[in-house]
Curated annotation (Swiss-Prot):
Database matches in InterPro entries: RidA, RidA_CS, RutC-like_sf, YjgF/YER057c/UK114
Highest taxon listed in the record's lineage: Archaea
Cellular-component GO terms for this entry: cytosol
Source organism of the structure: Sulfurisphaera tokodaii (strain DSM 16993 / JCM 10545 / NBRC 100140 / 7)
Protein name: RutC family protein STK_08110
SUPFAM superfamilies linked to this entry: YjgF-like
Phylogenetic placement of the source organism: Archaea, Thermoproteota, Thermoprotei, Sulfolobales, Sulfolobaceae
Pfam families given in the database record: Ribonuc_L-PSP
Family according to the record: Belongs to the RutC family.
GO molecular function annotations of the record: deaminase activity
């Protein structure tokens, strides 16, 4: 088991790792829209926040030797399901050809009052 950390993604806001690599599988902790340069939530709508979350995930999987095409499963937590279509429009830019399996649920609140959080599982082979 290997801990994955990159300065190109935000530091965890609690006692957990950015990601854990076990063999050919990578477990990426839930990411919220924190700009790693400022350590603050990005200001903006669900599209802006989704883009930041996916950029953070992209950097974490890259640091572990994976890519977004290796994402097998995504877990998405939205503050408001009315944001679903706008979220999907940005999400589709990152997962064009073979999107991963996905769960999307509405939650009452997220850390730092983010609008979105995404966790992923990647697999090679």
């Amino acid at each position: 088991m290997e801990t994955v950390f990159t300065e190109k993604a935000p530091k965890p806001v609690g006692p957990y790792s950015q990601a854990i690599k076990v063999g050919n599988t990578l477990y990426v902790s839930g990411q919220i829209p924190i700009d790693p340069r400022t350590n603050e939530i990005v200001k903006g709508d669900i599209k802006v926040q989704t883009r930041q979350v996916l950029d953070n995930i992209k950097e974490i999987v890259k640091a572990a030797g994976f890519s977004l095409s290796d994402v097998a499963m995504a877990f998405v937590f939205l503050k408001d399901m009315n944001m679903f279509n706008d979220f999907n429009s940005v999400y589709a830019e990152y997962f064009k050809d073979k999107p991963p399996a996905r769960v999307t649920v509405e939650v009452s609140r997220l850390p730092k009052d983010a609008l979105i959080e995404i966790a992923v599982i990647c697999s090679k082979g």
